[in-house]
């Protein structure tokens, strides 16, 4: 902000000491420091507010650009839908006359539909697909073990006793 070197600061201090005197100099220095700090804080606040306003301006501009792009996409989709809807309505109203562009070549395939069959349409393939679906929805055993709620809870000691071989167990005595 101000280009004050060490020599300039010393010169200002000596002049202030001569003009103000040693009694009033500390109080004036404190007041000047406080005012200087307030000025710096005020300047920093103004800078922050200006940058915030600039960022808000940029965000508003970006928002308006995105809204314009969204409306352009929406209008193009609506126009496209209206065009295809009118084509389909014309084809529906005309009855038998269907344009090949709308049908996608389906008119040519209608004559061949009885002659060709889907390769996987045999009964064995149907059963295989059914088994595949069953396997697809089956839950893995590791997942069942990890997520199911235990109904038979055992303590650690009971579990050890259960899985310890008979030769390693202590003999039980009954009176």
From Swiss-Prot:
Compartments (UniProt record): Cell inner membrane
Keyword match Cell inner membrane: yes
Signal peptide range in chain numbering: none
InterPro entries: TatA/B/E (IPR003369), TatB (IPR018448)
Topology within the bilayer: Single-pass membrane protein
Chain ranges passing through the membrane: 1-21
Keyword set includes Transmembrane helix: yes
One GO process term, biological-process aspect: protein transport by the Tat complex
Family of the protein in this entry: Belongs to the TatB family.
Function description: Part of the twin-arginine translocation (Tat) system that transports large folded proteins containing a characteristic twin-arginine motif in their signal peptide across membranes. Together with TatC, TatB is part of a receptor directly interacting with Tat signal peptides. TatB may form an oligomeric binding site that transiently accommodates folded Tat precursor proteins before their translocation.
UniProt-recorded name of the protein: Sec-independent protein translocase protein TatB
Natural source organism: Paraburkholderia xenovorans (strain LB400)
């Amino acid at each position: 902000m101000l280009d004050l070197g060490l020599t300039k600061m010393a010169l200002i201090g000596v002049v202030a000491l001569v003009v103000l005197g040693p009694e009033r100099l500390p109080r004036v220095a404190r007041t000047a420091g406080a005012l200087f700090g307030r000025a710096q804080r005020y300047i920093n606040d103004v800078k922050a507010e200006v940058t915030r306003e600039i960022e808000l301006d940029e965000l508003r501009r970006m928002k308006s650009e995105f809204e314009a792009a969204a409306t352009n996409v929406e209008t193009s989709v609506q126009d496209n839908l209206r065009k295809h809807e009118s084509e389909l309505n014309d084809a529906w109203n005309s009855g038998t006359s269907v344009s090949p562009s709308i049908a996608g070549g389906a008119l040519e395939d209608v004559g061949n539909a009885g002659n060709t069959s889907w390769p996987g349409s045999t009964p064995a393939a149907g059963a295989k697909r059914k088994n595949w679906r069953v396997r697809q929805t089956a839950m893995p055993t590791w997942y069942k073990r990890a997520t199911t709620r235990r109904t038979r809870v055992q303590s650690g000691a009971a579990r050890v006793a259960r899985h310890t071989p008979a030769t390693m167990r202590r003999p039980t005595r009954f009176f």
